[in-house]
Amino acid sequence: MSRIIGRKGINYIHRLNSASFTSVSASSIEKGQNRVIDASLTLIRERAKLKGELVRLLGGAKASTSLLGVPLGHNSSFLQGPAFAPPRIREAIWCGSTNSATEEGKELKDPRVLTDVGDVPVQEIRDCGVDDDRLMNVISESVKLVMEEEPLRPLVLGGDHSISYPVVRAVSEKLGGPVDILHLDAHPDIYDCFEGNKYSHASSFARIMEGGYARRLLQVGIRSINQEGREQGKRFGVEQYEMRTFSKDRPMLENLKLGEGVKGVYISIDVDCLDPAFAPGVSHIEPGGLSFRDVLNILHNLQADVVGADVVEFNPQRDTVDGMTAMVAAKLVRELAAKISK
């Protein structure tokens, strides 16, 4: 089903051709696609330039977090609601029920801590028949546009977990070398090619590791893993910390030091790393997960230069009426912004 939906844009173009545009050549369609992609990148480029200039004029920031939304859900193997997450997370970040300071006292209203460059228009691009190979390149290029405007660093709002591959690829290529990755998730997302989709949200870290974009990959919160997940972990030298041993691993995981000898550390948080008691609004509910304070302890105590991050797999269509998981995702974003900015 996901592969059929994944080709929706291409099928849409085919229907147009058969119905009323039979004389439109493939090259003309490609030129049109290129115009849409160029326009999409131009908007992100100009917004990043504006936000970067603002932060530089204010001065005093060595690193500043900039939000980039990637509302992509078609690579999910189950539900596609994560495509609707970025606006809900933004709404929750600025919800009047809480203040705009992080736990460590950083003020989110200060552009040196947090800016926003908008969303990659995923559905608009796909509606023009753009395939996933090109779409992944657009996402990577968008991340690089943010990073070109120093001191901005990307904090990406998913979307399903397939977005981590093009984002990490962009961060690694832009910095000129691999990073260490701290990945919090109920699942390892390291299938070689899940259900025939190499870009599946269940395969993102296989693409990252085989591309050489990460030196170390630490996966924390794992509690849904099969034989292939373990074999792939061994193949790539992944450090997998399962929930069944978390009480034993906790002292080490709450005092991590990462990134020495590489270009920095990337943090990827799948909201389903949390126990569903804390975050019910996810596509793949897995009981027995981390508490929210477990996650914050890991983040707050981490010794690292965090060069990028993502928060993925929040599904607003499964959230509670009062938007509890949206607030949870927003809190993760707020604390990640504090960790990145300096």
UniProtKB/Swiss-Prot annotation:
GO terms for cellular component: cytosol; mitochondrion. SUPFAM superfamilies: Arginase/deacetylase. Catalyzes the hydrolysis of L-arginine to urea and L-ornithine. The latter can be utilized in the urea cycle or as a precursor for the synthesis of both polyamines and proline. Possesses agmatinase activity. Catalyzes the formation of putrescine from agmatine. CDD domains: Agmatinase-like_2. The keyword Transferase does not apply. Forms homohexamers. This is Arginase 1, mitochondrial. Substrate binds at E195, G196, N197, E313. Its cofactor is Mn(2+). The lineage of its organism: Eukaryota, Viridiplantae, Streptophyta, Embryophyta, Tracheophyta. Mn(2+) 2 binds at D185, H187, D270, D272. It catalyses: L-arginine + H2O = urea + L-ornithine; agmatine + H2O = urea + putrescine. It is found in: Mitochondrion. Binds 2 manganese ions per subunit. GO terms for biological process: arginine catabolic process; protein hexamerization; putrescine biosynthetic process from arginine, via agmatine; urea cycle. Belongs to the arginase family. GO terms for molecular function: agmatinase activity; arginase activity; cobalt ion binding; magnesium ion binding. Residues 1-22 form a transit peptide. Its main location: mitochondrion. Mn(2+) 1 binds at H161, D185, D189, D270. It holds the Pfam family Arginase. Pathway: Nitrogen metabolism; urea cycle; L-ornithine and urea from L-arginine: step 1/1; Amine and polyamine biosynthesis; putrescine biosynthesis via agmatine pathway; putrescine from agmatine: step 1/1. Keywords: Arginine metabolism, Hydrolase, Manganese, Metal-binding, Mitochondrion, Putrescine biosynthesis, Transit peptide. It comes from the Eukaryota. Disruption phenotype: Increased formation of lateral and adventitious roots and increased production of NO in roots. L-ornithine binds at S77, G96, S97, T98, N99, D189, I190, Y191, S224.
